[in-house]
Swiss-Prot record:
GO terms for cellular component: cytosol. GO terms for biological process: riboflavin biosynthetic process. This is 5-amino-6-(5-phospho-D-ribitylamino)uracil phosphatase YwtE. The keyword Hydrolase applies. It comes from Bacillus subtilis (strain 168). Its EC number is 3.1.3.104.
């Protein structure tokens, strides 16, 4: 049995954050051919479920924080240490860095989150008048369009209420702030960091990660490493590549993924996932 693990943003989703009909139909063809297809993403499970619509396939979400099988049955979850999470949240608040908290039912964000990012972008534009900021703002708005996002007045209170917390996501246009946050995170041994974009830091439990979750799902189905096909574009897909026998980088992927890949497919705006699946099903990719 083969397994295809597919990232979402920058991979299965196009620049409009939509799954094209071509990609959706290709996944169905792979499933009909007896291949286990799973989504492996940094997004929350409920957000993925809303996007997948009629595709009943396993979901690895929150960078490995949760694994759901077909039928939306929870297989595994890896929770963030509350004390460690609160410590880094306090740091982010002290530096005025926008962040979201991934829980079972919501993506919790600060009540003033959108205004905070808009102020950062205004500063960036003032310092760099020739900077093209429309695409940057569109990237920020993707965060606020996610299913289940819920702005709250005192986001730090989530760490006192007994919520299951899987991940924190930071977003900033201030690269110095992000650099400092990455350095701060190195002191928190119970936490790990990765990224799905230039302006993003994803914070997760040290024992979490896409690669570990993909290995766990493959073990449940009795799938060997050489039969795992991982498709991605960003730094948070590197751990998937480490456990997959076949590593498919998108044309729009970072260079490090392309260097580690066994195949480079078309971009996410050219239905690159569908292109690779068709190559695999037709025998053109061995």
């Amino acid at each position: 049995m083969k397994c295809i693990a597919i990232d979402l943003d920058g991979t299965l989703l196009n620049k409009e954050s939509v799954i094209s009909a071509e990609n959706r139909e290709a996944i169905k063809r792979a499933v009909d051919a007896g291949i286990l297809v799973t989504i492996c993403t940094g997004r929350a499970t409920f957000d993925v479920k809303a996007l997948l619509d009629d595709l009943d396939i396993p979901i690895i979400a929150a960078n490995g924080g949760t694994i759901h099988d077909t039928g939306y049955r929870l297989i595994s979850r890896t929770l963030m240490d509350q004390e460690a999470g609160k410590a880094i949240a306090d740091y982010l608040l002290s530096k005025n860095i926008y962040f979201e908290v991934y829980t079972d039912d919501h993506l919790l964000s600060p009540f003033d989150g959108e205004a905070k990012l808009h102020a950062e972008l205004d500063i960036l534009k003032s310092a760099n008048p020739n900077e093209q900021t429309d695409d940057l703002w569109q990237g920020a708005m993707t965060q606020f369009k996610q299913f289940g996002i819920k702005p709250i007045p005192h986001i730090e209170s989530v760490f006192d209420g007994g919520e299951n917390i899987y991940k924190l996501l930071c977003f900033s246009f201030d690269m110095d702030k992000l650099k400092q946050a990455k350095e701060e995170l190195k002191h928190h041994k119970k936490l790990a960091q990765t990224s799905s974009g230039k302006h993003i830091i994803e914070i997760l439990p040290a024992s979490s990660g896409k690669g570990r979750a993909l290995t766990k799902l493959a073990d449940i189905y009795g799938i060997e490493t050489q039969d795992i096909y991982a498709i991605g574009d960003s730094p948070n897909d590197l751990s998937m590549f480490e456990v997959a026998g076949h590593r498919i980088a998108m044309e729009n992927a970072i260079d490090e993924l392309k260097e580690k890949s066994t195949f480079v497919t078309k971009s996410n705006d050219e239905n690159g996932v569908a292109y690779f699946i068709d190559q695999l099903l037709s025998g053109q990719y061995a």
